[in-house]
Design a protein with these regions (language model features):
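Helix-loop junctions on the cytosolic side of multi-pass membrane transporters
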Residues: 1-11, 200-210
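Juxtamembrane intracellular "pre-TM" segments in multi-pass secondary transporters
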Residues: 2-34
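Pair of pore-lining "gating" transmembrane helices in MFS-fold secondary transporters
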Residues: 26-44, 126-127
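Short amphipathic helix-loop junctions that connect adjacent transmembrane helices
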Residues: 49-64
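Juxtamembrane helix-start elements in MFS-like secondary transporters
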Residues: 61-70, 121
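Transmembrane alpha-helices of Major Facilitator/SLC transporters
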Residues: 66-87
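C-terminal transmembrane helical hairpin of 12-TM major facilitator-type secondary transporters
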Residues: 94-138
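A late C-terminal transmembrane helix in Major Facilitator Superfamily
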Residues: 130, 142-178, 185-188
Length: 215
Protein backbone atom coordinates (compact mmCIF):
# COMPACT_ATOMS: atom_id res chain seq x y z
CA UNK A 1 0.00 0.00 0.00
CA UNK A 2 1.27 3.47 -0.90
CA UNK A 3 2.34 5.23 2.30
CA UNK A 4 2.93 8.70 0.85
CA UNK A 5 0.02 11.09 1.53
CA UNK A 6 -2.11 11.82 -1.53
CA UNK A 7 -1.37 15.56 -1.43
CA UNK A 8 2.36 14.86 -1.65
CA UNK A 9 2.22 12.44 -4.57
CA UNK A 10 3.55 13.48 -7.95
CA UNK A 11 1.13 13.38 -10.87
CA UNK A 12 3.62 14.13 -13.62
CA UNK A 13 4.10 12.11 -16.80
CA UNK A 14 6.99 10.12 -18.20
CA UNK A 15 8.80 13.15 -19.62
CA UNK A 16 8.72 14.92 -16.27
CA UNK A 17 9.97 11.75 -14.60
CA UNK A 18 13.08 11.76 -16.77
CA UNK A 19 13.54 15.45 -16.02
CA UNK A 20 13.52 14.53 -12.35
CA UNK A 21 16.35 12.09 -12.99
CA UNK A 22 18.28 14.90 -14.62
CA UNK A 23 17.83 17.08 -11.55
CA UNK A 24 18.93 14.23 -9.28
CA UNK A 25 22.09 13.56 -11.26
CA UNK A 26 23.11 17.19 -10.74
CA UNK A 27 22.97 16.78 -6.95
CA UNK A 28 26.65 16.04 -6.20
CA UNK A 29 26.23 14.94 -2.60
CA UNK A 30 23.52 12.44 -3.54
CA UNK A 31 25.52 11.09 -6.47
CA UNK A 32 28.68 10.67 -4.41
CA UNK A 33 26.93 8.58 -1.79
CA UNK A 34 25.24 6.55 -4.52
CA UNK A 35 28.61 5.95 -6.17
CA UNK A 36 30.05 4.93 -2.80
CA UNK A 37 27.30 2.34 -2.54
CA UNK A 38 27.87 1.25 -6.13
CA UNK A 39 31.57 0.61 -5.53
CA UNK A 40 30.75 -1.23 -2.29
CA UNK A 41 28.31 -3.35 -4.28
CA UNK A 42 31.16 -3.94 -6.70
CA UNK A 43 33.06 -5.67 -3.91
CA UNK A 44 29.98 -7.72 -3.04
CA UNK A 45 29.39 -8.88 -6.61
CA UNK A 46 33.10 -9.54 -7.16
CA UNK A 47 32.94 -11.81 -4.12
CA UNK A 48 29.77 -13.51 -5.36
CA UNK A 49 31.30 -14.13 -8.79
CA UNK A 50 34.69 -15.35 -7.59
CA UNK A 51 33.97 -17.25 -4.37
CA UNK A 52 32.57 -20.47 -5.95
CA UNK A 53 35.74 -20.90 -8.00
CA UNK A 54 38.09 -19.95 -5.18
CA UNK A 55 36.43 -22.09 -2.52
CA UNK A 56 35.52 -25.12 -4.64
CA UNK A 57 38.23 -25.25 -7.29
CA UNK A 58 41.21 -23.61 -5.59
CA UNK A 59 40.62 -24.88 -2.04
CA UNK A 60 38.81 -28.08 -3.05
CA UNK A 61 35.69 -27.76 -0.91
CA UNK A 62 32.35 -29.35 -1.81
CA UNK A 63 29.36 -27.31 -3.01
CA UNK A 64 27.69 -27.92 0.36
CA UNK A 65 30.71 -26.62 2.28
CA UNK A 66 30.79 -23.58 0.00
CA UNK A 67 27.11 -22.87 0.67
CA UNK A 68 27.81 -22.90 4.43
CA UNK A 69 30.67 -20.41 4.00
CA UNK A 70 28.51 -18.23 1.77
CA UNK A 71 25.70 -18.21 4.33
CA UNK A 72 28.07 -17.33 7.19
CA UNK A 73 29.48 -14.41 5.21
CA UNK A 74 25.97 -13.23 4.39
CA UNK A 75 25.28 -13.07 8.12
CA UNK A 76 28.27 -10.71 8.46
CA UNK A 77 26.64 -8.24 6.07
CA UNK A 78 23.29 -8.39 7.84
CA UNK A 79 24.78 -7.98 11.31
CA UNK A 80 26.90 -5.03 10.17
CA UNK A 81 23.91 -3.34 8.55
CA UNK A 82 22.02 -3.67 11.83
CA UNK A 83 24.95 -2.40 13.90
CA UNK A 84 25.48 0.64 11.66
CA UNK A 85 22.26 2.23 12.94
CA UNK A 86 23.88 2.45 16.39
CA UNK A 87 26.26 5.16 15.17
CA UNK A 88 25.08 8.60 16.21
CA UNK A 89 25.76 9.96 12.74
CA UNK A 90 25.48 7.93 9.51
CA UNK A 91 28.70 9.59 8.26
CA UNK A 92 30.55 7.67 10.97
CA UNK A 93 29.25 4.33 9.75
CA UNK A 94 30.06 5.10 6.13
CA UNK A 95 33.57 6.38 6.81
CA UNK A 96 34.38 3.54 9.22
CA UNK A 97 33.15 0.99 6.72
CA UNK A 98 35.07 2.51 3.81
CA UNK A 99 38.35 2.65 5.73
CA UNK A 100 37.81 -0.93 6.87
CA UNK A 101 37.03 -2.06 3.32
CA UNK A 102 40.24 -0.57 2.00
CA UNK A 103 42.45 -2.06 4.73
CA UNK A 104 40.89 -5.50 4.44
CA UNK A 105 40.82 -5.45 0.63
CA UNK A 106 44.58 -4.89 0.64
CA UNK A 107 44.96 -7.77 3.11
CA UNK A 108 42.83 -10.08 0.94
CA UNK A 109 44.79 -9.14 -2.18
CA UNK A 110 48.14 -9.85 -0.50
CA UNK A 111 46.87 -13.07 1.06
CA UNK A 112 45.47 -14.45 -2.21
CA UNK A 113 48.58 -13.46 -4.15
CA UNK A 114 50.76 -15.35 -1.67
CA UNK A 115 48.56 -18.46 -1.73
CA UNK A 116 47.04 -18.18 1.74
CA UNK A 117 45.19 -21.03 3.40
CA UNK A 118 41.42 -21.32 3.34
CA UNK A 119 40.81 -20.09 6.88
CA UNK A 120 42.89 -16.98 6.30
CA UNK A 121 40.82 -16.26 3.19
CA UNK A 122 37.53 -16.96 4.97
CA UNK A 123 38.28 -14.82 8.02
CA UNK A 124 39.46 -11.91 5.89
CA UNK A 125 36.39 -12.15 3.65
CA UNK A 126 34.09 -12.27 6.69
CA UNK A 127 35.71 -9.11 8.04
CA UNK A 128 35.67 -7.40 4.62
CA UNK A 129 31.99 -8.11 4.08
CA UNK A 130 31.25 -6.93 7.62
CA UNK A 131 32.87 -3.54 6.99
CA UNK A 132 31.08 -3.33 3.66
CA UNK A 133 27.76 -3.93 5.43
CA UNK A 134 28.44 -0.96 7.70
CA UNK A 135 28.14 1.35 4.69
CA UNK A 136 24.90 0.00 3.26
CA UNK A 137 22.43 1.42 5.76
CA UNK A 138 24.30 4.64 6.52
CA UNK A 139 25.10 5.56 2.91
CA UNK A 140 21.55 4.84 1.78
CA UNK A 141 20.31 7.13 4.54
CA UNK A 142 22.74 9.89 3.56
CA UNK A 143 21.91 9.59 -0.14
CA UNK A 144 18.15 9.69 0.35
CA UNK A 145 18.37 12.47 2.92
CA UNK A 146 20.18 14.66 0.40
CA UNK A 147 17.50 14.15 -2.27
CA UNK A 148 14.11 14.34 -0.58
CA UNK A 149 12.30 16.27 -3.28
CA UNK A 150 12.40 13.40 -5.79
CA UNK A 151 12.71 10.55 -3.30
CA UNK A 152 11.09 7.92 -5.52
CA UNK A 153 13.29 8.62 -8.52
CA UNK A 154 16.33 8.90 -6.24
CA UNK A 155 15.63 5.46 -4.78
CA UNK A 156 15.19 3.97 -8.25
CA UNK A 157 18.44 5.47 -9.52
CA UNK A 158 20.31 4.29 -6.43
CA UNK A 159 19.22 0.70 -6.97
CA UNK A 160 19.87 0.79 -10.71
CA UNK A 161 23.42 2.11 -10.38
CA UNK A 162 24.31 -0.33 -7.62
CA UNK A 163 23.21 -3.37 -9.62
CA UNK A 164 24.75 -1.97 -12.80
CA UNK A 165 28.03 -1.73 -10.91
CA UNK A 166 27.71 -5.38 -9.95
CA UNK A 167 27.09 -6.36 -13.55
CA UNK A 168 30.17 -4.48 -14.72
CA UNK A 169 32.51 -5.73 -12.00
CA UNK A 170 31.54 -9.41 -11.94
CA UNK A 171 33.24 -10.42 -15.23
CA UNK A 172 36.48 -8.67 -14.22
CA UNK A 173 37.34 -11.29 -11.60
CA UNK A 174 37.55 -13.88 -14.36
CA UNK A 175 40.35 -12.11 -16.20
CA UNK A 176 43.64 -13.98 -15.92
CA UNK A 177 44.42 -15.52 -12.53
CA UNK A 178 41.19 -15.33 -10.54
CA UNK A 179 43.06 -14.96 -7.24
CA UNK A 180 44.96 -11.92 -8.46
CA UNK A 181 42.08 -10.31 -10.36
CA UNK A 182 39.72 -10.73 -7.41
CA UNK A 183 42.12 -9.05 -4.99
CA UNK A 184 42.82 -6.19 -7.39
CA UNK A 185 39.10 -5.66 -8.00
CA UNK A 186 38.47 -5.48 -4.25
CA UNK A 187 41.19 -2.87 -3.76
CA UNK A 188 40.13 -0.68 -6.70
CA UNK A 189 36.48 -0.67 -5.60
CA UNK A 190 37.47 0.06 -1.99
CA UNK A 191 39.67 2.99 -3.01
CA UNK A 192 36.91 4.49 -5.17
CA UNK A 193 34.37 3.96 -2.40
CA UNK A 194 36.52 5.79 0.17
CA UNK A 195 37.27 8.65 -2.24
CA UNK A 196 33.55 9.15 -2.92
CA UNK A 197 32.86 9.29 0.82
CA UNK A 198 35.62 11.81 1.50
CA UNK A 199 34.49 13.96 -1.42
CA UNK A 200 30.86 13.84 -0.27
CA UNK A 201 31.91 15.02 3.18
CA UNK A 202 33.54 18.04 1.58
CA UNK A 203 30.14 19.07 0.21
CA UNK A 204 29.37 20.31 3.73
CA UNK A 205 31.80 22.46 5.74
CA UNK A 206 34.64 20.22 6.94
CA UNK A 207 34.23 21.39 10.54
CA UNK A 208 30.57 20.37 10.45
CA UNK A 209 31.41 16.99 8.91
CA UNK A 210 34.07 16.20 11.51
CA UNK A 211 31.77 17.27 14.35
CA UNK A 212 29.11 14.91 13.06
CA UNK A 213 31.58 12.03 12.97
CA UNK A 214 33.15 12.48 16.39
CA UNK A 215 30.13 13.85 18.27
Amino acid sequence: KESLPVEKRSKTGIVSTFRNFGAIVHNPRYMLYVLQLAFAQGILFAYIASSPFIVQQHYGFSPFAFSICFAVNAVAIGVAAAISVKFRQPETGTLTGCIGMLCLSVCVMIALYNGCGFWTYELLMFALLFTMGLTFTSSTTLAMDSERRYAGAASALLGALCFASGGIVSPLVGLGNILVSTGVTFVVCAICSLLCTLWAMRKVPMKVAMCRIFR
